[in-house]
């Protein structure tokens, strides 16, 4: 039985800044995997503890492989032969992670103390796996983030549709209800700032859609704006402290900007970015530096993607892609080099990618089921999106490196509007 202990996760000897430089590897090709052997050294534990430690080790190996750059393999004691190795030593409830490169002397890299809370222990394993992934590749690991999404079930005759926000790990574990508003909550979007993992979302609990601020620590949403009309699709730039959203406060669904601080709330008055003559706007997404927005407009008839500079001055929008004319849900990658979006191709909404460096766009998915809402992981090489039809929808992971998809098995219900974030700022 796990004992209740004070949670302590710490770095040993400042190894991330020092030893990581010795361990760093340049993976030249995105299709090249670095072999790593993982060994679990278990002390004199009872059978239940041994089984639990092995399950945590399996999670660790899966976490390392998630980024599609490392090829971890769990081996028995004395069988390590890969260029890099990780030994997990159990001094229950403490786990020590030791890294070795070739014949170099092994050095302790990280240590953690297990608690009796399985969810906390899983998160600790995710975080150490991501730290090691970053130390070896200089690419952020992606197993420690959270995916927040809207989960709804088909209403009975005459009932209004309801949906609450939930969070889940990439592997479908640690499923947790966030809102309990008995209403419809949609389009959550991480702020990627602060230690309490805040996110914006839209709720219909007051009758018409308004923007609220929630967090993993405080799930009771707080209304953000005192603005008339419907409010939709909030996104935030932590660099510029700006909230972008869509509102019909002046009659037409337009793009707005609002200064915002998680601690102080809205700062100043919202600014309308475009006038009504430009058409109907939707789906804004900030560039990483917060100077630009990509959004959807139907000013030319069909919804298409546009980019507009909003800082230091608002400029005229420009058309992003001419290849696809029925586009939606753009999402700017954290590295600033790519924009994922949806477009209707041969009658099916598919996930596509626009490369800002080349000006070319690509179709990423091909299956005959509608997809929507792509959201980036912190490494800019993996996406989560929803796929389904009216009344049913599931979440999927997509790797740009392998071009493979993987369903997140959650259970019954319609899952939509995923947002991948909440990554610890420790890589």
From Swiss-Prot:
It is found in: Periplasm. Residues 1-20 form the signal peptide. Coiled coil: none annotated. Gene3D superfamilies: TolB, C-terminal domain. Pfam families: PD40. One of its GO terms (cellular component) is periplasmic space. It comes from the Bacteria. Its main location: periplasm. Keywords: Periplasm, Signal. The keyword DNA damage does not apply. InterPro entries: 6-blade_b-propeller_TolB-like, PD40. Belongs to the TolB family. This is Protein TolB homolog. It comes from Chlamydia felis (strain Fe/C-56) (Chlamydophila felis).
